[in-house]
Curated annotation (Swiss-Prot):
It comes from the Eukaryota. Has the structural arrangement of an alpha-helix connected to antiparallel beta-sheets by disulfide bonds (CS-alpha/beta). This is Beta-mammal toxin Tma1. It is found in: Secreted. One of its GO terms (biological process) is envenomation resulting in negative regulation of voltage-gated sodium channel activity in another organism. Keywords: Disulfide bond, Ion channel impairing toxin, Neurotoxin, Secreted, Toxin, Voltage-gated sodium channel impairing toxin. The keyword Secreted applies. It comes from Tityus macrochirus (Scorpion). Beta toxins bind voltage-independently at site-4 of sodium channels (Nav) and shift the voltage of activation toward more negative potentials thereby affecting sodium channel activation and promoting spontaneous and repetitive firing. This toxin acts on human Nav1.4/SCN4A and Nav1.6/SCN8A voltage-gated sodium channels. One of its GO terms (molecular function) is toxin activity.
């Protein structure tokens, strides 16, 4: 199990600034996580997700590239 920021197919974090309050928690649950929240109103952070779920990594960041 791991935690971290959800990323999309483009390698960018899931934004949540304009999303409903439960958006991140729902997205994390869809990926078998046990919860999550919108960190600083910018990106979804999830807890206890399976290792196969892609999460943001500064060393492997490819957002916008």
């Amino acid at each position: 199990k791991k935690e971290g920021y959800l990323v999309g197919n483009d390698g960018c974090k899931y934004g949540c600034f304009t999303r409903p309050a439960q958006y991140c928690e729902s997205e994390c649950s869809l990926r078998k996580g046990t919860g999550g929240y919108c960190y600083a109103w910018l990106a979804c952070y999830c807890y206890n997700m399976p290792d196969w779920v892609p999460t943001w990594n500064s060393a492997k960041n490819r957002c916008g590239k």
